Structure formats: C-alpha cells, structure tokens
Regions:
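Transmembrane alpha-helices and adjacent helix-loop boundaries
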Residues: 1-156
Length: 156
C-alpha cells in the first residue's frame, strides 16, 4: 500500500500529460485533417501531389520516428521546440494525415448527385463542401474517427 501511495503522484502526472496531448492533438488535428483532405482532393496537381507525399510520409513512418525527428532534427536547421511542443506537433501532423484519409473516404462515399445539385444551384465550392457535403461526411466517418481517437489515447 505504501508503494501505491508513493507512485500515485507520478501516475497522476502521467495521466495529466496523456490528457493534455490527447486534447491538443484532437483539437488541432481534426480541422487540419479536413484542410489536408480538401487539398488532397484539389484539381491543382502540385497541391494534390504534395499532399499525397505528406500523407504517404506521415502514415508510412512510425510516430516515434516523427517525434524524434521533430525534437532532434529540427534544431539542426535552427528550429528548437521544447519536448511538450515537439510531441504535440508530431502527434498533430501524424493524426492529421490519418484524419485526412478518413475524411477523403467519407467525401468519396457521398453520392455525386449531391455535388451536381449544388452546381445546378450555383453554390460556391466552399458552400458546397461546408454546407452540404461535410455534414453528411461527419455522419459517415464518425465510427472511423472514434476508432482513430481511441488509437490516439493508446499512442499517448
């Protein structure tokens, strides 16, 4: 019992850190994932290509390697981040790539008639995506987002 009382403050501190990293990552990576998704769906080839490369790198390399690169690699080029910020940036960039692919799958699952109807009504692309498409996408991708958020808790 004495041992439990002795280590409890350290466990609570670790729990606080886990919650902080989870909250910061969820708050920033989901909107960034939507932006990256829309860039991935762009008709501008260079934006589409660069976004594909970003997603490929982020999803294809281990998260620990990305954290190490951001914490130890960026100071080589003069960008120094403290360990909490480096961890948060790595998590945000990593999970934004995963969320982007989830949202892209959700957008691709929407019937093309929705896009055509918005075009006939002469709605702008931003109104089409943010007013018509994304609300439907959230309903579709909600289970996948939940799974990814559970993975985020485990990763932190």
């Amino acid at each position: 019992m004495d041992y439990i009382i002795e280590v409890l403050p350290f466990m609570l501190d670790g729990f606080r850190t886990t919650l902080w990293v989870f909250a910061i990552t969820a708050i920033f990576s989901i909107p960034l994932g939507i932006i990256v998704c829309l860039m991935r769906l762009s008709k501008i080839r260079i934006i589409n290509f660069l976004t594909q490369v970003y997603i490929l790198i982020m999803r294809g390399t281990p998260l620990l390697l990305q954290i190490t690169f951001i914490f130890f690699g960026l100071p080589i080029v003069g960008i120094v981040l403290n360990r909490e910020l480096a961890t948060a940036v790595a998590f945000i960039l990593n999970y934004a790539a995963y969320f982007a692919e989830i949202f892209r799958g959700g957008i691709n699952s929407i019937d093309k008639g929705q896009f055509e109807a918005a075009k006939v009504l002469k709605l702008s692309k931003s109104t089409t995506y943010f007013g018509i498409i994304l609300p439907q996408v959230f309903k579709t991708v909600f289970p996948s987002l939940g799974n990814e958020l559970i993975t985020l808790v485990k990763d932190t």
